Amino acid sequence: MTSSGKIRIYELSRDLHLENKDVLDAANKLSISAKSHSSSISDEDATKIKKLLLAQKSSNSSSPPAKQKPNKEILTLKKAITSPPTKSEANAKTNASLDKTSSLKNKPASPKKEIPTSPKPPSAAKQRVDAIKKPTPSISKNNSLKVQPTIKKPSLVSPKQPNIPSPPIAPNKGIKPTIKRQDSNNENLETNKTKAKPNIVSKPQARQIKQSSDLINRSPKTSPKQPIQEIQTNKPKAPQRPIAPPPRPKVQSQFNQKPGNNNLRGGPNQRKGIPQGAPSGQPGSTKHPRNLPTGSYKGNRVELVGAPIRRNTKPDNGGRGARDGNFRQGGPNQGPPISRQGGARRQEGGGGRGQQMRPRTGMPPGMRKPVAPGELMQLQKPTSSATPPIKRGDLNKGPKKDGISTAKPPANRPTPSAAPKRPPARTGAPGSSRKRKPDWDDAAKLEALRNKSPQKQRQKVHIIGENDDALTAETSGFAGGGQAVVLSASLARPGKPKASKKSGSKPTGALRKRKKESTRQRQRRRAMELRAAREAKQIRPEMIVVPEDNITVQELADKLSVESSEIIKSLFFKGITATVTQSLDLSTIETVAEEFGVPVLQDDIEEAAKKTVEMIEETDIKHLTRRPPVVTVMGHVDHGKTSLLDAIRKARVAAGEAGGITQHIGAYQVEVEHEKKLRTLTFLDTPGHEAFTAMRARGTKVTDVAVLVVAADDGVRPQTLEAISHARAAKVPIVVAINKIDKEGASPDRVKQELSEQELVAEEWGGDVVMMPVSAIKGENIDKLLEMILLVTEVEDLQANPARLAKGTVIEAHLDKAKGPVATLLVQNGTLKAGDVVAAGPVLGKVRAMVDENGKRLKEAGPSCPVEALGFNEVPTAGDEFEVYPDEKSARSVVGERASDARATRLAQQMASRRVSLSAMSGQVNDGDLKELNLILKADVQGSVEAILGSLEQLPKDEVQVRVLLSAPGEITETDVDLAAASGAVIIGFNTSMASGAKKAADANSVDVRDYEVIYKLLEDIQLAMEGLLEPDLVEEKIGEAEVRAIFTIGKSAVAGCYITNGKLQRNCKVRVKRADQIVFNGDLDSLRRNKDVVKDVSSGFECGIGCDRFANWKEGDTIEGYKLVTQRRKLNT
C-alpha cells in the first residue's frame, strides 16, 4: 500500500496468492489501467479485482470449463477414467506420488535434450493451484498405479544413433517400480518445499513395471463421454496447441518412471533453468544433465514418457475433449496427445504461456520431436559430434491399437551437437503468430537466470515478452556453428524464420542494386539505348511534320533520324551556335532539313486538312439522297493539274492564267456519262506552288476523292508528298493520274516505284491504289480516269439532305471593286438559296446573288455545288464553315461570339509577331544594323493573301525585318496610300487594281506602289528591296600590274622605274608590292610620272616612274599590283 492510498499489483497478487498476470488480466477485463506488476491502482479498483477473481474461482470450481477456440488448446492424452473421484483426493494422491519419485529417480541416460524452466516460489505455486480449474477424472485406488505413467509421461521416439549408441541405464534399485497416484499439484508444492537444491529434469524415463506399458497401450481408450481435465488458462480465449505425441502400444521400462514436477506453474527448479528429476544429494543426478537424457532403450530406440497435464472437461459433441485417433494438427477437433516432461513447456494456467511447440510435418498425430539439452542456445554449447537428422517418414510408421494412432520410434536420434535445423515456421499455421508473456515477476529472477546459464559466444539471451512471436515460428530460425538450436520457451526469443529473412532481404538487395547506378551510368545507358534505336531506324523519312511551335535541335535530330551533333555541326557552318536544347525557327529547320534532303511540312497546315465538322446531322438521316462527289486535283507545280481539268472540261483555262500557273482554287462541275447516265462531278483545282499550301489543305478538307497528278518525266516531288499527307489527314481515297506520258523520258513505272515507297502501291502491283497513265495534252485515257473516279466514289456512301438549310465551306474569298466581298462557297449539305442569311465564321451576310463558274446566275445551289455568293458585310476567311440561319437575329448572336474570339486571336498573333527583345533592338539601332521594310499588301482573294504572307515568313530576317502593316483582299484605296505615306511603307498589289484617287494620292505623297500578277516576281522584288536596305560591301577590283626594272634615288626617297605589263595604273590608286610571293607593301600610289611629266594613268606597254611616300625599299623584280575599292550590293544571308 502506497502512501497515497493506492496498492500495487504485485501486493494485491501476494495477498490473493495469485500470479501478477492473473491480477493484470482481471484489471484488463475491468478496464483498469495497469501496465505492469509495479503499477498502482486505487483501493476501489483493487476491491473490484478481488471480487472478480473470487467469482472466477468459484465459477471455475463449480462449472465445467467453457469451450475454447480451435487450434489453441494444449492437449494431453489421459487414461480413460471409470469413476471421477473428488478433486482434493485426486490432487493429493498425484502430488504425493510425484514428490516421492521425483526426489529419487531419473539419471540421464541418452542424448535427449531437456528444456529448463524458470523457478517459482512454492507459495506462488500453491496459490496458483487454487486458481486452476480442478475437475479431474475419478480414479480408483486400484488404478492409481496404472494410470500415473500413462497420463504423465509422453511416449517420444528418439532416432537411431549409428555412431555412439547409448547403453540403457539400470534403474535405481532404491525405488519401487510402482507409484501410487496422488495429486500432481500437491506433490509439486511438497517437492518444492523440501528440495534444497534444484533438480535436473532429464528426458522422461519409462517405468520398469509391466503395468506401465500395458496402461500406455490402453491409455488412448478414453471414452468420449468421460471428460479429460485441462488447466484453465488465464486467457480462456487463447487455446493451445498439442505438443505431446500419442502413446506407444508397448513400452519396455528399464528405468524407474520419473513423474517429475508437472505442476503447470512449476517450482523453483524450473525457474532457475535447471532440469528436474534427481535430488541434490543423489550421485549422478547432475553429472550429465545436458548430454544424456533419461529413458528406456529398446534396441537402439529410446522411449520417453511425458508428464501429465490436466485438461478441461469438454462436451462430447464434436469437441476436442474426448477424441481419439489420428487428429489433424491444429485442427478444430484435436485428440488428447500426451504432454512432454518438464516445466519448460508449461501450460497457460498460472504462467500465461500462450503457445507450444508444434509437431513436425510428417510425424504421427500428436508426436513431437524430443528436444535435447544441447540445443538450448543460451545454456549449453554444442558438442562436436554430429549425426544425421531424423527422418520424418519413419515417424509415421507405427502400429495402431484400439483405433488409436500410435507412434513407432525412429531408427536414429541425433546427437546434441548435430541437431538438424528446423524448417521455418509455417505461415498460417495455428499458433504461429501468438504472443507470449513472461514467466517471471521481477528483474532479480531474470538476472539470476542469466548468471546461472552459460551462453554461447556472440549469442544473446532473448527473453520472451508479451509481444513476442510464437515459439514455433522463432526457434526454427536459430542455428549456431552449423547446428540447429532449440530454445527454451521460458528463456529465449529466437529471431525471425530464415525464410522470412530471405524474403525480406531480397527487396533490400534489389533496392541497393538500383541505387548503385550513378547518374553518369544512367546517362550512358540512355545514350546507348537511343543510339540503338536510331541505328534500328536508319531509313531517313521522306518528309517531317513540324509543329506550329518551334522544336529543339534534339527533336529535329530525332525526326531526321540523325545524331544531334550532325545538326549542331550543320548550324555551326552556317554561323549559328546551338545546343541540343535550343529551339529552332521554321526557316532554320527547313534549311537544315534541306541539307539532308527531307522536306518540311508544318503541323498546323496538316491539321487544316483534317475534317473537323460533320455536315450531316441526326435529323438528316431520314432524308438523305445521293450527292455528286467532290474531287480535288492536287500535285506538284507544273505537273499538269489545270491542263488535266481543261481536258476534262474541254476548256482552255490554263492558257488564260498568269504565268501559266494556278493561283486560286478553281471550282467546276462537269457532267460525265457513266453507264448511259449523266453523272455530275465537282472538281476543285488547287495551286501547286509551294506558297499555296493552305489552299491545298482547304481543298482536301472538303473533298471526297483526291486525284494526285504526277508528271511521268519528273516523278514524286515535295508538293506531291505534301498532297499525299493532306489526303491521308483528311482520310480520303487517292486516285493517281500519271500525266505527260507522251513526253520524252516519261517513265510511269518509275513513278509507281517512287509512290510505292510512300505506301501507295498500284493495283497491278498488288496494292489498292488506282493509278492511270494519262496525257492531258492529247486527251489519252481521260475517259478511263473519270470512270475510275466514279467507281471509287461509288464505294464511298456520299449522301446529303437537300431539304434543309445549307451548310458548307468557304473555298475562296476576295473583294471585288464592283461587287464588294465575294466568297466562293461549296455547299456540302442542304440547299443554298438567294436571300438566305449566312454566317461564315465571324462574318455575317445575306445572299444577294449567286453565280456558277461560268458566270450564270443561280437561284439555288444543292449539295456539292460550288457557287460565288455576294452580300457579305466583309470578306470572309477562306476555309471557314458557313451555315444558313432561319433569321438574322440568331445568326448575329452567333457571329458576335465568333467575332470576339477572332479579334482576340488576331491581337495575340500581332503581339507575338512584334515581340522583340528591347536590349537587342537598342543594340541594333546603335550599330545601325536594324533595318525594317514596311509593306501594305492587297490581293484579289483571301487565299492569295495567305500565300504571300506565308512566303514572306520564310525570307531571312537576320538583318532586315519585314513588317506587314496591312494585308487584305481588295483594291488599293486612298486610305492605304495615306497609311503607307505615314509609315514609309511600300504598297504591294497582287492581281488587283487601284481605286479612284489612290493613284493621285500615291504620286502626291511619293508612295511606291507595285502591282504583280505572278507570285514569283512579287517575292523576288521584295527580297531585292530587303537587300537594298543593307549596307553595301567594299570589294577590291584589280586595275593593272607593273614590273620594277630600275631604281632611282632622289634625295631621301627612291623611285621605281616600271613597265606596265597588264591593265593600267592610276595615280592615287591602291597598290600592293609583292616580292617572291610575299607582300612587302600595301598602300597608296602617290606619284606617277612618264618622261618626267606627271600623268593620271599609264596604260599597258608603257614605262613610268612610281613613287610612294611611305615606301622606298624598292628592288628590281618586284611586282606592283594596282587595284581600287568598289561597293557591291549585299545579299541576304540565307
UniProtKB/Swiss-Prot annotation:
Encoding gene (name): infB
Location of the region described as G5 in the Swiss-Prot/TrEMBL record: 775-777
SUPFAM superfamilies referenced in this protein's UniProt entry, alphabetically: Initiation factor IF2/eIF5b, domain 3, P-loop containing nucleoside triphosphate hydrolases, Translation proteins
Keyword Chaperone: no
Biased composition (Polar residues): 56-65, 83-105, 137-147, 208-234, 251-264
Region ranges (Disordered): 55-465, 491-524
Keyword Transport carried by entry: no
Keyword set, alphabetical order: Cytoplasm, GTP-binding, Initiation factor, Nucleotide-binding, Protein biosynthesis
Ranges of biased composition (kind: Basic and acidic residues): 391-403, 438-450
Stretches with biased composition (Basic residues): 495-504, 511-524
A Pfam family: IF-2
Localization per record: Cytoplasm
Residue sites binding GTP per the record: 635-642, 685-689, 739-742
NCBIfam families found in the cross-reference section: IF-2 (TIGR00487), small_GTP (TIGR00231)
Summary of the function given for this chain in its UniProt record: One of the essential components for the initiation of protein synthesis. Protects formylmethionyl-tRNA from spontaneous hydrolysis and promotes its binding to the 30S ribosomal subunits. Also involved in the hydrolysis of GTP during the formation of the 70S ribosomal complex.
Protein name: Translation initiation factor IF-2
